[in-house]
């Protein structure tokens, strides 16, 4: 378990997410002076042996400036156009600043669909690993130009967490315009107290997180806490800290008590189960009876058709489904062995009847335990 006191000694790979409010002139294009300061801090980390992956916002705000737009558009095609124009300036700014220190950068644009495909997921992981081995700093952003609502990450906090899983990062730093996670909303309660350190499984941290975001970005504090939970699947510790603090990254590395540190306190998932838990979009839902829920949660067993009481969605064999209890609470998710219409025929029946019901059998399990991940 990585704590604040041993961050310097034990962490070697960081994912740093920088929000649009910290990179732009209040939405009017990139703040080149601010970007130079961020790169300077990251160069300092590099000099202390830290491998860096950057997840950077700012392309839409830069595109708005270049196109002469004063308000963030709401239509997807206009957002995509702004992102396409602005991404050019964003990458140029990073490349220029890192080049002053003899460091190469690489642009990587991804969609959720890229990570949902196991082969492409592994290819992305291998590519980033190779870049890091060659001393290159990858700059990652969502591929807004081609993305649709169905394959969006939704915000760069989520993208940063999934990137941390992808590269098995030791530390995820989410930089924001707030000091960290408070026990209440500091914008409305002046007596709210900063949470310096907490275990990521702590039950009340989601309730503490404000869901209010700024006008330029999309992610509020709630998305940052959920990102920390996702990052914890790979054993990654998460800092949520203010980007307004001077020299914040080297100071976090030195162990200074800045921001909020959310510590992963559960056993990390295997690489395959991290992919299952974080990178696939659910195509359907199975409602389980009480016996099936207990079998999954207490015994780590596979899911049998007899334990399914209801279902919804439309899925094919091998696609992700969410398993819920009778109160609609998520229990697990996994890759289903039978498509929707066949699952509909065999649910509630013992596995010995599958061949009779379908005319063939592809195994006794609806979801094998190797392809199933329990809910946090």
From Swiss-Prot:
TM regions (residue ranges): none
The biological pathway it contributes to is:
Amino-acid biosynthesis; L-proline biosynthesis; L-glutamate 5-semialdehyde from L-glutamate: step 1/2
Keyword annotations for this protein, in alphabetical order, are: Amino-acid biosynthesis, ATP-binding, Cytoplasm, Kinase, Nucleotide-binding, Proline biosynthesis, Transferase
- What would be one Gene Ontology cellular-component term for the protein? cytosol
All copies of domain PUA, residue ranges: 283-361
Has UniProt tagged this entry with the keyword DNA-binding?
Answer: no
What the entry lists under HAMAP family is as follows: ProB
Q: What does this protein do?
A: Catalyzes the transfer of a phosphate group to glutamate to form L-glutamate 5-phosphate.
Stated name of the protein: Glutamate 5-kinase
Q: Which gene encodes it?
A: proB
């Amino acid at each position: 378990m990585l704590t604040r006191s041993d961050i310097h000694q034990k962490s070697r790979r960081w994912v740093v997410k920088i929000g649009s409010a910290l990179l732009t002139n209040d939405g009017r294009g990139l703040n080149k002076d601010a970007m130079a300061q961020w790169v300077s801090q990251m160069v300092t980390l590099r000099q202390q042996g830290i491998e860096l992956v950057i997840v950077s916002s700012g392309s839409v705000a830069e595109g708005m400036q270049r196109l002469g737009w004063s308000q963030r558009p709401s239509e997807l095609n206009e957002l995509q156009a702004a992102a396409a124009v602005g991404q050019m300036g964003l990458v140029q700014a990073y490349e220029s600043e890192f080049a002053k220190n003899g460091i190469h950068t690489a642009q990587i644009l991804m969609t959720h669909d890229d990570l949902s495909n196991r082969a492409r997921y592994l290819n992305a992981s291998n590519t980033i690993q190779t870049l890091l081995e060659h001393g290159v700093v990858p700059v990652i952003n969502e591929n807004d130009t081609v993305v649709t609502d169905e394959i969006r990450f939704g915000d760069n906090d989520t993208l940063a967490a999934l990137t941390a899983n992808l590269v098995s990062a030791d530390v995820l730093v989410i930089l924001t315009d707030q000091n960290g996670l408070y026990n209440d909303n500091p914008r409305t309660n002046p007596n709210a107290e900063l949470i310096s350190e907490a275990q990521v499984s702590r039950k009340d941290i989601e309730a503490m997180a404000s869901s209010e975001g700024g006008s330029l970005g999309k992610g509020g504090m709630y998305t940052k806490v959920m990102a920390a939970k996702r990052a914890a699947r790979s054993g990654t510790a998460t800092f949520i800290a203010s980007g307004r603090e001077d020299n914040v990254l080297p100071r976090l590395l030195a162990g200074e008590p800045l921001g909020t540190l959310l510590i992963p306190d559960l056993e990390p998932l295997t690489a395959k189960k991290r992919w299952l838990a974080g990178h696939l979009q659910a195509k359907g839902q199975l409602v389980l009876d009480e016996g099936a829920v207990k079998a999954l949660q207490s015994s780590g067993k596979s899911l049998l058709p007899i334990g399914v009481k209801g279902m919804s969605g439309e899925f094919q064999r091998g696609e992700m489904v969410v398993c819920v209890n009778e109160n609609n609470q998520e229990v697990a998710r996994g890759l289903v062995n039978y498509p929707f219409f066949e699952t509909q025929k065999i649910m509630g029946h013992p596995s010995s009847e599958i061949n009779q019901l379908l005319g063939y059998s592809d195994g006794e399990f609806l979801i094998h335990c190797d392809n199933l991940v329990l809910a946090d």
